């Protein structure tokens, strides 16, 4: 995905919009320790001329993301990472609403020809198996529908490790971001 963007011989740095919630915004972390600066550093270290735009808003839901997407795309964007839905699940919002909002976000990005990496989320266990069965298929279903790349669980390898999470047990530490 990223390699293909770099191969297009652009004169300017590839601009990736990291569009999400507090996990994207780096909630509770010092400046420079969050996901966006860590991703940009890693990609640059691998030789990619890239700028990662911080489109993270703490507390945001898929509805909030949909409402602010056009504004967030005001600058030139060559690709997008969409990481939304955790707050929908934490609030127990209906999974069908999260699905509809993410579907609309991916549709708008596709209409602009912006390739997407969709970062999946998991529902909290306390919401039960019915909620989980409705929520968790959203990401693979929509990635397939919109021909987006899928990272199945944004917090993979981090969520279950208390040492990689802040005291709230939800947000990664600087080490967890890595």
Which stretches of residues belong to each language-model region?
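Bacterial N-terminal signal peptides
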Residues: 1-6
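Serine-esterase "nucleophile elbow" of acetyl-processing enzymes
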Residues: 10-58, 66-76
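Alpha-helical cap/lid subdomain in secreted, periplasmic
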Residues: 38, 45-48, 64-178
């Amino acid at each position: 995905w990223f390699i293909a963007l770099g191969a297009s011989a652009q004169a300017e740095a590839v601009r990736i919009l990291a569009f999400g919630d507090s996990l994207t915004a780096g909630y509770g972390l010092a400046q420079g320790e969050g996901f966006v600066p860590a991703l940009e550093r890693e990609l640059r270290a691998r030789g990619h001329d890239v700028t990662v735009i911080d489109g993270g808003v703490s507390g945001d839901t898929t509805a909030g993301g949909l409402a602010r997407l056009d504004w967030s795309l005001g600058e030139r964007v060559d690709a997008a990472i969409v990481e939304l839905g955790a707050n929908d699940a934490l609030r127990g919002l209906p999974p069908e609403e999260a699905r509809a909002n993410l579907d609309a976000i991916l549709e708008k990005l596709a209409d602009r020809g912006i390739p997407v990496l969709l970062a999946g989320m998991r529902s909290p266990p306390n919401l039960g198996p019915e909620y989980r069965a409705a929520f968790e298929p959203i990401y693979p279903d929509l990635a397939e529908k919109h021909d987006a790349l899928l990272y199945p669980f944004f917090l993979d390898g981090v969520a279950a490790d208390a040492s990689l999470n802040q005291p709230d047990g939800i947000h990664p530490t600087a080490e967890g971001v890595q």
